[in-house]
Amino acid sequence: MRHRLRHDRHLAFAYRHAAADILAIHPNSAALFYRKIRTVINYHLALAADEVFEGPVELDESYFGGRRKGRRGRGAAGKVVVFGILKRNGRVYTVVVDNAKSETLLPVIKKKIMPDSIVYTDSLSSYDKLDTSGFIHYRINHSKEFVDRQNHINGIENFWNQAKRFLRKYNGIDRKSFPLFLKECEFRFNFGTPSQQLKILRDWCGI
């Protein structure tokens, strides 16, 4: 484990210095540069946050910051709880929440999803109230095999996997900065190829 931590720190150090070499700036300046880019991303995604999803939508919660302990829905000591909403064949929306209880998630769901939309969730009890909240609610059970190919949350789970794989290289992100990194993951998932993302960033930054 100690060897793995040293390896991860070396990777993060290498990433920062490689970026600094490309930009011909000091490594600390490279870190500041990337923070400014993430701030721009966060600003523009916040402007679009009022977009309402409709049609088939997948909902799920995930825990960041290492191995989760404790019961789902009650938060997890030392972990960051993130709630995600994915419109199938569309974009993902994420938000950091205090916990995954129904009273925390339901207001986000009602604000972000059009009434009468089809929503897919796992069997977490926090989603029980969706049955009486104006949505067409389907639950999936990972322990069973379903014939209905539509009854899944593979899309949002794919996003979680991509986000965690991307964030792992930083070997720990402080809670204050985490939302900016999360929105970078959301941006990368939603906005096409790297070349398309670069074009969008240039437009947003006015360069």
Locate the predicted segments by residue:
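Residue-level recognition of single "structural anchor" positions
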Residues: 1-207
